[in-house]
Amino acid sequence: MSSIPRQRPRRRAALAATAMAACLALTATACNGDEDADAGAQPSEEASTGDDQLQDLIDNLPFEFDVEAWMDGAWADWDEETWLREVGDFVNPIIDGLWDQERMGEAEDPEQSIDDDQIDEDQNAPEADDPMADRGITDPEPVAVEAEAVPTPYTENGAPIGKVFFDSPEGPMVCSGTVVKDPNAPGQSNLVATAGHCVHAGTGGGWYRNLSFVPAYNNNGLGAAEIESAAYEDVAPYGVWWADYVSTTQYWIDNGTESGGDGAHGDFAILSVAPENGSGLSLEETVGAALDINFDAPAVSGLGAVTLYGFPAADPYDGALMYSCVDYPGRLSIDATMPVMYWAGCTMTGGASGGPWLRTNENDEPELISVNSIGPLESTWLAGPRLDEEARGVLDYVSAEVSGG
């Protein structure tokens, strides 16, 4: 079973799972050999985009936007005419205290299941050395792998991973997400990777609201019944971080649906976040780590073992704990024109959506190659998109908007 150890100066920890080993540094550059990275993190020049950028976003909206009315509850009006949908049309004013322990506990998982009838397996598909040759192929269904609880405290064993909270027309919802590196802000990233369906409704709607990220949620692994009355710092040890910018793939926006596999090949998103109560430090400096994303991963035959993480919330889980699964992924193709998806045995359920798929690269370091997207009603496997140039464009777009470049 994999864990993500907290990294301290001059200490190299390992993520061990089956044949998989990697360093998930909690300091910004320790995996790159900078052993003094935690000797005294300096505040980033811009830990948040601030009021000026919010006003710029508001000024560019296609209708008049009343911030005070929004914060007083107008955000709960999901009228189609004011439900922002397009890339760049996103506002998310911080509402202090909205995501308290009680409301976090009420958040439901967004169902993203797929019917077996949508999957056409090829029992004899040959392996490929080129990712392009993986397109259009679906390997036999993976054997279920029982998810295992990640050791606590999560600040030591999984700090870059947390929960993504948001409001949809159905009420408060929850997914999972991961702190990832910002190419334009090395060591000071405020970026989080998650699934597209955790930020945008796809073809039937627009951007979700009150998007926030809580890294190392429920740090000490309290039971679900204990969380509501627990100390806030036990539930959100690094605080609540509100999205100030977000983007997903155009493929998800144009094709994504609430259930089934439509749009799943592009089910990826990046959030830029800022702390509800500003600390002057970036998210990466605060939690101590950010992961690389590999947008040019090998063909499935060369991936090796992968570890899937998330906070499953649907039965038999309750969303309180972080879990992981380790498996060797196969190929899944719903749209043969798109890069292949990966699927792997895993019993995690809804709520794990957006959680990372990690593999060990040739430098013996962890990298994110996908995020949890869809699974069957029986919860025996999970699938995630191969991250390609369109996904890279999502990261680059958000990075350029918030960090320059």
Residue ranges of predicted features:
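Cytochrome P450 catalytic-core helices
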Residues: 194
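Chymotrypsin/trypsin-fold serine protease catalytic domain
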Residues: 264-342
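C-terminal cap/linker of serine protease catalytic domains
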Residues: 369, 378-405
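N-terminal export and membrane-targeting signals
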Residues: 1-21
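Conserved catalytic-core segment of clan PA serine endopeptidases
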Residues: 149-159, 165-168, 180-183, 200, ...
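Catalytic nucleophile loop of clan PA
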Residues: 347-371
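C-terminal motif of bacterial Sec signal peptides marking the signal peptidase cleavage site
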Residues: 26-30
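Protease-domain processing segments flanking chymotrypsin-fold serine proteases, especially trypsin-like
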Residues: 33-186
